[in-house]
Amino acid sequence: MSKKIGILTSGGDAPGMNSAISFLAKSALSLGFEPYLIFDGYSGIIARKILPAKNFPYNGISSFGGTAIGSSRFPEFKKEEVQNKAVEILSEIGISSLVVVGGDGTYNGGYKLHLKGIKVIALPGTIDNDIQFTDYTIGFDTALNTIVETIDKLRDTANSHRRCFVVEVMGRHCQDLALYSAIATGSEILITNTNILTPEEVSQRVLEQFAKGKPSVIVTITENILPNLKEFAAKIEELTKISTRSLEVGHTQRGGRPSAFDRILAAKMAMKAMELINQDKSGLAISYLDGKIQTFDIAKVVSKPVRKTNDLVLEINKINQN
């Protein structure tokens, strides 16, 4: 077994990725491996942006947001000839094992390399929390805290002006960021891909909330549902005659120093990944499920790209709407 291990981050960046990188490198060294950092995701393999970890200050990056080795979306990697080129380049360098950190696209890319003989272990690094068989992904907790802080501040000004705010958060096709932030902030109305409401329905609920004596109403929405957030807010104002503003939280959700939870989660997953590589395992994804670090076949994980939200969380959210 080759002692050279590649480490890359791919897809959208997520707070905690740097902690994963740091602990992957340190764990690899402690087991006698030679870690290599691959810059800018899968495209970095093709571009030969590969550097021995010993030549990079990986020790001091755990507290920083983003990913110090860069990331990218590389749709060309779906082509078999590009995958074959990646295997050829990794083999030339002597890298026989690879740890990839990212979302479902990253998992799919890693699985293709696994099928071609590269030993691959995958870590869930995405703020969307949309990976199957893990309760939390690296970056989700930090992004959630960013959203909660933003909505809490909106609530302050909304209370002062008897106003309604419509807030759109990230999550792609997964409702977890919207759902968990709605629970944490007491958002009165939640719109997700499993709970779509018309402007008329939202307006009726807004009026009901103000009729109860509430000084403000927060509407939290998952991205990719509304064609135009500002127009939606304007329609609510038109129907209710209540001052309504909109806010797209945007890419601030991806930034910021990772929470302690994300740093620790990344560290635990990284150490488990290196344990598996030391056992000559491949084609496995690391997860945090039911309070334990576990492993699943990557093939099983990517076959179900959208997670189902815990039923208990959904029930708690129903209570929050009253």
From Swiss-Prot:
Keyword annotations of the record: Allosteric enzyme, ATP-binding, Cytoplasm, Glycolysis, Kinase, Magnesium, Metal-binding, Nucleotide-binding, Transferase
Annotated Pfam families: PFK
Residues engaged in binding substrate: 126-128, 163, 170-172, 223, 245, 251-254
Binding of ADP, residues: 155, 186-188, 212, 214-216
PROSITE patterns tied to this protein: PHOSPHOFRUCTOKINASE (PS00433)
Regulation: Allosterically activated by ADP and other diphosphonucleosides, and allosterically inhibited by phosphoenolpyruvate.
Ligand binding (Mg(2+)): 104
Similarity annotation: Belongs to the phosphofructokinase type A (PFKA) family. ATP-dependent PFK group I subfamily. Prokaryotic clade 'B1' sub-subfamily.
Assembly: Homotetramer.
Cited function: Catalyzes the phosphorylation of D-fructose 6-phosphate to fructose 1,6-bisphosphate by ATP, the first committing step of glycolysis.
Name of the protein described by the UniProt record: ATP-dependent 6-phosphofructokinase
